A protein has these predicted regions:
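C-terminal motif of bacterial Sec signal peptides marking the signal peptidase cleavage site
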Residues: 19-22
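Bacterial signal peptide processing site
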Residues: 24-26
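Short, well-ordered beta-strand elements
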Residues: 53-63, 115-118, 137-140, 172-174, ...
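N-terminal lobe/hinge region of extracytoplasmic solute-binding protein
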Residues: 60-109, 142, 204
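Gly/Pro-rich hinge or "lid" segments in bacterial periplasmic/extracellular proteins
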Residues: 95, 182-241, 247-250
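Aromatic- and charge-enriched surface segment that lines or borders ligand/interaction sites
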Residues: 105-150, 256
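Alpha-to-beta junction loops
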Residues: 137, 170-172, 251, 256-262
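Surface-exposed binding/hinge segments that line
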Residues: 153-195
Length: 262
């Protein structure tokens, strides 16, 4: 049951990414605040129904990020919702919860269900401009599994990982101790650059938004990543500010005044 809840959580955290990716700009370049629950694009300001590129929104969140900005150490759902816009895994869920290849271009699973092979997508960039390598992927998976560390997995689901091998510069083989039909969903876990020593201070991923700044108890700011690999699904927004508003009454007031868009 615990593993099933984990899988559902991995699929649900994509919801905010969908909202940010499909927001419609209003007249002032900000998102329309009249609909705070749906990612469906409004056609009122744009008769063709096509999303408008650019602009910014401010999203109200009930509390500051209380755990790590390191995606392998964060546990709170609110943190994951934000980090899911910064980081990507070998696969990622779409708006319907289907797992699609992301940093990986394709994948296959052995007949015994114990070996997962991924072909990496060519030219995927981290936010610092470096290119994702097989070594980065190997490092990320081994880090989650506690391999080459103190043996303690950073991500519990990866305790089943036996080893990770690189047959060639664009291929990764992940060997499991036991077959696990839910393991593919765990591979939404963030691929991070091996050369970044402190992801808490420098959150570097491959997602459609890159981290800009954080003011504790005030806000977290993300901006569009112009070199995002998925050219057909670029972020529409240029900037997203997550503003901490703990009082639910204040949220309503700010939405009405336009201080918050969502």
């Amino acid at each position: 049951m615990k593993k099933r809840r984990s899988v559902l959580a991995l699929l649900l955290v994509a919801a905010l990414t969908v909202v940010l990716g499909g927001c419609q700009d209003g007249k002032d370049g900000k998102a329309d605040s009249s609909d705070t629950t749906s990612s469906q694009v409004s056609t009122e300001s744009t008769p063709t129904g096509e999303p408008v590129m650019g602009g910014s929104i401010t999203v109200g969140i009930p509390q500051d990020i209380e755990d790590s900005l390191d995606p392998h150490k964060s546990v709170a759902a609110g943190t994951k919702e934000i980090l899911f816009n910064i980081y990507e895994g070998l696969v990622k869920p779409d708006e319907e919860g289907n797992l699609n290849d992301a940093v990986a271009e394709s994948h296959s699973i052995s007949e015994d269900g114990k070996v997962y092979t991924f072909k990496l997508r060519n030219g995927v960039k981290f936010h610092d401009g470096t290119t994702v390598t097989a070594e980065d992927v190997k490092y990320s998976i081994e880090r989650c599994a506690g391999i080459n560390g103190d043996g303690t997995p950073l991500v519990e689901a990866f305790s089943n990982v036996d080893k990770v091998e690189i047959p060639d510069e664009s291929t990764i083989d992940i060997y499991l101790k036991e077959a696990d039909t839910e393991f593919l969903a765990y591979l939404t876990v963030a691929i991070v650059p091996e050369h970044v020593e402190d992801l808490e201070a420098d959150p570097v991923g491959t997602g459609p938004f890159h981290y800009v700044s954080r003011s504790p108890q005030e806000n977290i700011v993300l901006e569009k990543f112009s070199d995002y690999w998925d050219t057909e699904n670029q972020a529409y927004l240029d900037k997203v500010t997550f503003r901490i508003v703990k009082d639910s009454n204040a949220v309503v007031t700010n939405l009405k005044s336009g201080t918050l868009d969502m």
